[in-house]
């Protein structure tokens, strides 16, 4: 199936997907803990009958049961060597069931391992895992791909890149979101939509997370940004436990009624996930068959993103600053740190610039004495783990830009692409492949343009070439190419002409670097500020500048105010209030006469009495935590004081931010690992007697369940709080859990389960513990677990996440 054919199919929709596979196979006898793909191949008639029933119910696209048939998952069952054979046979089963009446989508999902820097799996290794599976299923005759039930945007990116590098089949991608509207990693539906459609996905959506009613709002949000069709595949409500059996209570008619609302909200591809049956799909098909199809946006919005934040660029919106500080040019201290492999200054520069109002951060690692590509990649990992601002990738080397774009977990900006043949011919296809925006630098092989007319001709040429290869005007920001007025008295005027031309004639946003305009002049800040305010009035959209220069930033806020831009009055007042609070009782110097800015490293200042150790944990500064701990020890603080007065309060604050959805899984893990480093350093210095040792806790993922991301985080957090944690791993029998708890005299047993099919193994542990006289408190958690389930099976408590688990354990042991 071609992408054009897929697009036409949806235009004639709504397109009906199938319903649940797993929950229906369990009803048919699939045991807990087996490899689903292997069981299906051993019981093919059950799978074929289920999918035949879906086709009879009106399904247009069947999901082949290749869901977890990737190398990493199959290896857990000792079946990795059978990957090709199994995937081919599974595709063939669905083709047999479809009988040409429905398309067959090769189904792919997450591997269960976390990507670096949160986990140990490297991005390129994950791409290879997906490529291996994609190659087989494409060759086996799959009509299209679906990448579903994803929690990590970066894993989605890896899958889409892998599939696009293997074949040209259409790709649908759907993520699963928490009740707060974000993934476990903090990505919202709008950000996921922008990133994945820019990367080349053919449909974007949501599956599994909730029942159909709760999917309406995320679908509406996606529809505001989507230039591709939207997919919705809800559960038949949320899972409930009745007499030890997981049930979904949304009936087929109610499901179909809600399905109509999803189509009205913008979904043009719709089906069912957990708990749905052919009856649900039949009712859904009947309910939506005559409904008009939502038409995606025909014009893209100019948007950059990180993994957790979206920044929209509009021609008449508020002025933006691209932070320029992460660049070693002229910064001797930064150069020295980079040569040593340290990114402490880079991390602090990122934090400072975000705090000072930068909307985007430029990242440049161009210097001698380092591996620039390796340093650029490491910097992207560090900065994206530290701040939420989207990044601007700045390098003179094509291969470095491509390497950075490949691993960047969002939609980045390239700085820059000119009309120089080497740059334009190589970088435009790279920008298109990775869905990036780019700054158009109006230079050619002949050098600088002689006048505005030549400059404008270069802009048009590059723009037309970008459109020719599949990009759009909305992917472009034009650099005004600022020259110094010392060499060209008309330099500023020519820039103003370019800004006006781009905005009014081409409808393109503009950017520039400010400092060139005043090169060689005294008191340059006045010239730069005057140039900026006039440039904004002529249509300048953003500038690459230092956001800590208050005179410049204040002028930008004031310019927006005078141009009556949206909420500019509120933004200006908030800015002035922030500065008044910052400088309360101090003398303000907006324009220092002398400034060695190139070598200044801002040190994290204490906030509300917070120590540098506290701040290092709060910000996840793994590179700086030990230095601060050593300083504290040298100043006379005792190891237990460092833990009790700095580390514990800091991780408590991280937990508060996590509860408020201001921090997400990446920040939580980064802070926890930072604290772990500090504790491991000071622990040998502690003088503890046995009475001071905290209790022992046995933690395990229950039998039949091979998911351990959440469990691993719980282990990390409990250890950081001083507990002696025995981690038994995943797929652990009840007998081993209870036996270990008795042997180690554990005060608490912690149980994890991701799947509804393995929830009841928790009850097995509770009952066996009672039978064996084990008086350990039992706490449980997992995606499908709730308080009522904990009460029903007789557990002592339920925790919704790792931070909550620490509080629960503390409370239970105080009783």
Model-identified regions with their sequence ranges:
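Domain-level signal for soluble alpha/beta catalytic cores
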Residues: 1-479, 483-815
């Amino acid at each position: 199936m071609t992408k054009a054919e897929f697009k036409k199919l949806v235009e004639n929709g709504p397109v009906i997907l199938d319903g649940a596979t797993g929950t229906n196979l369990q009803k048919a006898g699939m045991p807990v803990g087996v490899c689903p793909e292997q069981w299906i191949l051993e019981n093919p008639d059950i799978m074929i009958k289920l999918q035949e029933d879906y086709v009879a119910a009106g399904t247009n696209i069947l999901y082949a049961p290749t869901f977890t048939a990737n190398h990493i998952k199959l290896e857990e069952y000792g079946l990795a060597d059978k990957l090709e054979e199994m995937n081919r046979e599974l595709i063939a089963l669905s083709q047999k069931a479809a009988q040409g009446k429905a398309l067959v989508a090769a189904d792919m999902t997450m591997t269960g391992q976390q990507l670096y820097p949160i986990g140990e799996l490297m991005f390129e290794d994950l791409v290879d895992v997906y490529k291996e599976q994609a190659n087989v299923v494409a060759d086996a005759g799959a009509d299209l791909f679906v990448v579903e039930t994803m929690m990590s945007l970066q894993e989605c990116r890896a899958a889409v890149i892998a599939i696009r590098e293997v074949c040209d089949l259409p790709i649908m991608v759907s993520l699963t979101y928490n009740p707060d509207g974000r993934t476990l990693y903090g990505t919202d539906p709008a950000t996921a939509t922008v990133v994945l459609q820019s990367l080349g996905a053919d449909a974007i959506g949501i599956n599994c997370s909730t029942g159909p009613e709760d999917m309406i709002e995320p679908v509406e949000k996606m529809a505001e940004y989507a230039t591709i069709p939207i997919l919705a595949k809800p559960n038949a409500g949320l899972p409930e436990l009745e007499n030890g059996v997981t049930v979904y209570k949304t009936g087929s008619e109610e499901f179909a009624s809600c399905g109509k609302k999803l189509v009205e909200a913008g979904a043009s591809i719709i089906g069912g996930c957990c708990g749905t049956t052919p009856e649900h799909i039949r009712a859904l098909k009947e309910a939506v068959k005559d409904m008009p199809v939502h038409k995606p946006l025909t014009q893209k919005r100019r948007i950059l993103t990180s993994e957790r934040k979206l920044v929209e660029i509009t021609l008449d919106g508020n002025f933006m600053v691209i932070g320029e500080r992460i660049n070693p040019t002229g910064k001797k201290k930064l150069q020295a740190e980079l040569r040593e492999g340290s990114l402490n200054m880079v991390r602090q520069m990122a934090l400072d610039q975000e705090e000072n109002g930068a909307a985007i951060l430029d990242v440049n690692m161009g210097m001698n004495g380092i591996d620039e590509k390796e340093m650029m990649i490491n910097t992207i990992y560090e900065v994206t783990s530290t701040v939420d601002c989207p990044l601007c990738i700045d390098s003179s080397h094509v291969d470095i830009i491509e390497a950075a774009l490949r691993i960047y977990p969002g939609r980045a900006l390239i700085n820059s692409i000119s009309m120089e043949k080497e740059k334009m011919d190589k970088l435009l296809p790279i920008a298109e492949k990775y869905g990036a925006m780019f700054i158009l630098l109006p230079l050619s092989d002949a050098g600088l343009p002689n006048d505005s007319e030549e400059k404008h001709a270069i802009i048009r040429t590059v723009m037309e070439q970008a459109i020719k290869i599949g990009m759009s005007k909305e992917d472009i920001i034009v650099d005004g190419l600022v020259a110094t007025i010392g060499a060209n008295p008309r330099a500023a005027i020519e820039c103003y002409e370019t800004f006006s031309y781009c905005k009014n004639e081409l409808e393109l946003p503009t950017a520039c670097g400010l400092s060139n305009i005043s090169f060689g002049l005294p008191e340059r800040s006045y010239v730069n500020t005057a140039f900026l305010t006039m440039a904004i009035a002529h249509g300048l959209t953003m500038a690459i500048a230092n956001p800590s220069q208050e005179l410049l930033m204040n002028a930008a806020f004031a310019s927006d105010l005078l141009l009556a831009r949206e909420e500019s009055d509120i933004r200006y007042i908030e800015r002035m209030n922030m500065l008044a609070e910052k400088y309360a009782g101090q003398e303000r110097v907006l324009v220092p006469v002398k400034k060695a800015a190139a070598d200044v490293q801002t040190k994290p200042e204490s906030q509300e009495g917070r120590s540098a150790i506290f701040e290092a944990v709060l910000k996840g500064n793994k590179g700086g935590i030990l230095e601060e701990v050593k300083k504290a020890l040298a100043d006379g603080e005792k190891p237990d004081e460092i833990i009790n007065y700095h580390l514990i309060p800091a991780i408590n604050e991280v937990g508060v931010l996590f509860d408020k959805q201001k921090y997400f899984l990446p920040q939580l893990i980064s802070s926890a690992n930072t604290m772990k480093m500090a504790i491991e350093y000071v622990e040998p210095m502690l003088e503890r007697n046995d009475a001071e040792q905290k209790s022992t806790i046995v933690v395990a993922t229950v039998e039949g369940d091979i998911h351990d991301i959440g469990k691993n985080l719980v282990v990390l957090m409990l250890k950081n709080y001083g507990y002696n944690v025995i981690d038994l791993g995943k797929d652990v029998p009840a007998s081993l859990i209870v036996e270990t708890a008795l042997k180690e005299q554990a005060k608490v047993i912690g149980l994890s389960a991701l799947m509804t099919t393995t929830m009841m193994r928790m009850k097995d542990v509770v009952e066996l513990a009672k039978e064996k006289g084990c008086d350990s408190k039992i706490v449980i958690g997992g995606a499908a677990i709730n308080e009522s389930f904990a009460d029903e099976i007789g557990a002592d408590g339920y925790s919704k996440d790792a931070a909550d688990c620490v509080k629960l354990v503390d409370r239970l042991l105080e009783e």
